[in-house]
Amino acid sequence: MERAPALAEPEPRVQSLPMVKALNAGLRQALVADPKVLILGEDVGPLGGVFRVTEGLQSEFGASRVVDTPLAEAGIVGTAIGLAMRGYRPVVEIQFNGFVFPGFDQITTQLAKMANRHSGAVSMPVVIRIPHGGHIGAVEHHQEAPEAYFAHTAGLRIVAPSTPHDAYWMIQEAIASDDPVIFFEPMSRYWPKGEVDTLENPLPLHASRIVRSGTDATIVAWAGMVPVALRAAEIAAEEGRSLEVVDLRSLAPIDYAPVLRSVQKTGRLVVAQEAPGIVSVGSEVAAVVGEKAFYSLEAPVLRVAGFDTPFPPAKLESLYLPDADRILEVVDRSLAY
């Protein structure tokens, strides 16, 4: 009697994955679920992208769905816009954050405005994936945080996961959206592993979340600054201070409800970001909290940010980017009021 073939072991519901693998799995799920989903970008095919986020996808789904493009960001974004008008759901990969600017005109004057221009008769289900932030020891154009440019542009949704679990689910939700989504991926979080629950997604795409409870002050952060803020909270706890940390997750729109609840409890707010502080997402958060929670504040809203200078050479990166010590220094100023 022939032995029955062994059944393949099902993948575990909860897996420990780095963000690059979580994104890869999320993209694969989207490609399987909808034949209209396409991936476009430089070296996204056999190479799998600079960070290997698309590794193996072209061999599985073919070169007509995972498309290697020329080095021409304006052309890549423009092609994605045309594909969206024909009913496709293109996902564009930008190799590094500074490389998005050659495509900036297409994003801000066409992609963001197309649906409004046609009174809603045309939708723009385009996702633009952009590596975000620093902590990788690179040079200018490779580790900047350009979210404020896009957050100021009406018509774009902007998200920035900080964990592999969020990355897995948020990339799928972004692809399912009928609006254009700028999807920032913190490079400092690409490789550390985290638990990914592939069956349960507890939060909608644009929900912010309290990731650590506290009573003395609130820290708001996003993307690669979330683990830095959590580290600051751990150090503070050892010194007898209780800090609450809120992960925004979405930068446009911003879900302020958890932020305001937290500030009403703690009476103090510190906003931490990698980008320069001037005219930034952090500026907006500070302004809105000042408007909506003024009578709950025991101290001015304070910010920790990258300096208002061009990004420095790699060896000076650690001096430029906020770390736990800089966050705690500002927290101490807040608590001193």
Curated annotation (Swiss-Prot):
Matches recorded under Gene3D superfamilies: 3.40.50.920, 3.40.50.970
Binding residues for thiamine diphosphate: E73
Range of residues in the leader sequence: none
Catalytic activity annotation: N(6)-[(R)-lipoyl]-L-lysyl-[protein] + pyruvate + H(+) = N(6)-[(R)-S(8)-acetyldihydrolipoyl]-L-lysyl-[protein] + CO2
Key words, A-Z: Oxidoreductase, Pyruvate, Thiamine pyrophosphate
Subunit note: Heterodimer of an alpha and a beta chain.
Primary role: The pyruvate dehydrogenase complex catalyzes the overall conversion of pyruvate to acetyl-CoA and CO(2). It contains multiple copies of three enzymatic components: pyruvate dehydrogenase (E1), dihydrolipoamide acetyltransferase (E2) and lipoamide dehydrogenase (E3).
Protein name as it appears in the record: Pyruvate dehydrogenase E1 component subunit beta
Species for this entry: Leifsonia xyli subsp. xyli (strain CTCB07)
Top-level taxonomy: Bacteria, Bacillati, Actinomycetota, Actinomycetes, Micrococcales
